[in-house]
Amino acid sequence: MIADIKKDAQERMGKCVEATKNQMAKVRTGRAHPSLLDSIQVSYYGTMTPLNQVANVGIEDARTLSVTVFDRSAIQAVEKAIMSSDLGLNPMSAGATLRIPLPALTEERRKDFIKVVRAEAEGGRVAIRNVRRDAISDVKKLEKAKECTEDDVRRFEDEVQKFTDAHIKKVDEILAAKEIELMEV
């Protein structure tokens, strides 16, 4: 029973780290990256559709994304969706392809993005700690039901703390890498 709780907690902590990493990937750096446009929704025939379902996003060079729209009639909708996103991008139309030059980030904008990334990292840490709290409370319930001993609970708490620290360290490493990436000019 305790092994199941531990396994579940480790899986959930791993998912927290992965979710934090995915959230940080959406924060724009100076480099072009297709995942930058993942959060954009396009009004396609009256339905809000993810951009990657109506177009192919690729990298043209270090500071330019290319968006190849599958249906030519949707080019204006895709262009409008990209312009209205809060990413500060201005696409240029070239037939069925949109070229999106990424402007260089100002020092102030970089610092704003670092604040956003740090908040995401803190959210990830809190989620990991919540998983730890849930796992420990589950084991304490087992102890109250006389299904495990107090020593088992102490041993479990120590083990959970070790892998909690390991997962938080992963989040901190992801944060450090993202901060370095953001501060590159």
Curated annotation (Swiss-Prot):
UniProt xrefs under CDD domains: RRF
Species the sequence originates in: Shewanella sp. (strain MR-4)
PANTHER family assigned to the protein according to its UniProt record, in alphabetical order: MITOCHONDRIAL RIBOSOME RECYCLING FACTOR PSEUDO 1, RIBOSOME RECYCLING FACTOR
Location in the cell: Cytoplasm
Family affiliation: Belongs to the RRF family.
GO cellular component terms, semicolon-separated: cytosol
Listed GO MF terms: ribosomal large subunit binding
Function of the protein: Responsible for the release of ribosomes from messenger RNA at the termination of protein biosynthesis. May increase the efficiency of translation by recycling ribosomes from one round of translation to another.
Protein name: Ribosome-recycling factor
Keyword check for Cytoplasm: yes
Gene this protein is translated from: frr
GO biological process terms held by the UniProt record: cytoplasmic translational termination
Keywords for the protein's UniProt record, in alphabetical order: Cytoplasm, Protein biosynthesis
